[in-house]
Amino acid sequence: MNVSRPVNGIERLLKSLNCDGKLGIALLAACAVLLLPVLAGDAGREALRYDRTALAAGQEWRLLTAHFVHLDFDHAALNSLGLVLMWALFARDYRPRQWLAILLGSIAAIDAGLWLRDSTIAWYVGSSGALHGIMAAGTLAHLRRRDLDGWILAVFIVVKLAYEQSAGALPFTDNHSGVVVDAHLFGTLGGAGIAAFLAPRMESL
């Protein structure tokens, strides 16, 4: 005889936030990737950041590592919270390999955009651009399912990017001076561009 164990309230909550089982473990690991580099201090950040001069000298690893280091703990924590929000909204919309492609596509678009279009930017750190790519890809999945929140998210993204391109960083993000708003635009384009060629899950949760 098969007996199913009743699902309690906490388990239902974790599942609704895409934090149950292996997804929850993966989220903790992803947050650790963003938070732990802070322990390396200024030296670690300077060794891993996007640095135009260092890249020209052949230090290509910075094209990847720059997106996982931050100015300080507050900056890393803010981006970790953004990751948790993106995870809760979108984690089940694509398979893990698809999410990896979206992440790498977003990072590549940011790197290319900064190198080719923003030559005045000497250095860059942070995950916010990549998170914008993740948000764009998840929003596209919801639009394909004709979910109402997909349209709401799409309007939010367009309005946010338009504001940033015309007026600069949002007021509540100015605590970290020098926010590179173009990274948000490039990340969005990269994430949406990759997601356009992927098949998301089509059933709503």
Segments the model singles out, each with a brief description of its role:
Residues 153-203:
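Terminal transmembrane helical module of multi-pass membrane proteins
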Residues 26-41, 83-137, 152-164:
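Small-polar-interrupted transmembrane alpha-helices in polytopic inner-membrane proteins
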Residues 72, 115-124, 169-178:
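Membrane-interface helix caps and helix-loop-helix hairpins in membrane proteins
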